[in-house]
Amino acid sequence: MNTKSQFEIQDIMKILPHRYPMILIDRITEITEGVGLTAIKNVTINEPYFAGHFPAQPVMPAVLILESMAQAGAFLVLNTVPDPLQKNMVFSSISDSKFRIPIIPGDQVEIKMQLVKIRLGAVKLR
């Protein structure tokens, strides 16, 4: 259990197992333990996926936007449990996702996650 309200990338990497190039959150700017958080993903032209998606008009793939949301949610949950390095989280489903605006190099994505419920070891986030 952590009492900090903001986390930099070094702190995030102590909780999440993801590493470059798949760590897709850069900072936690606000967290209320067991309730919700706000995370930031800074998108730069140096992201490896921009080489092929799409070379002339780079756009962050939707599946990686979802992954950044999953990582923020995992951080929210793992930050509240004792000994988070001994826990495994698995993303199992998503519903009602819509992408209205493309994310391009130079954008800063704000990810807000809210804990809805925990039941029988399953976590529902919004």
Language-model segments: which ranges?
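Active-site helix/loop of acyl-thioester processing domains in fatty-acid/polyketide metabolism
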Residues: I28, M60-P84
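A residue-level detector for short acidic-glycine micro-motifs
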Residues: R27-E30, D96, I101, L115-K117
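Hydrophobic beta-strand-centered segment that forms part of the acyl-chain substrate-binding groove
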Residues: N2-Q6, G73-K112
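Short aromatic-glycine motifs in intrinsically disordered, low-complexity regions
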Residues: F7-R19, Q86
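Catalytic strand-loop segment that frames the active site of acyl-thioester-processing enzymes
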Residues: R19-M60
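HotDog/MaoC-like acyl-thioester-processing domains
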Residues: N2-K4, P17, E33-G34, I103-D107, ...
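Beta-strand-rich interaction surfaces with strong enrichment in secreted/lumenal proteins
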Residues: M13, A56, F99-I101
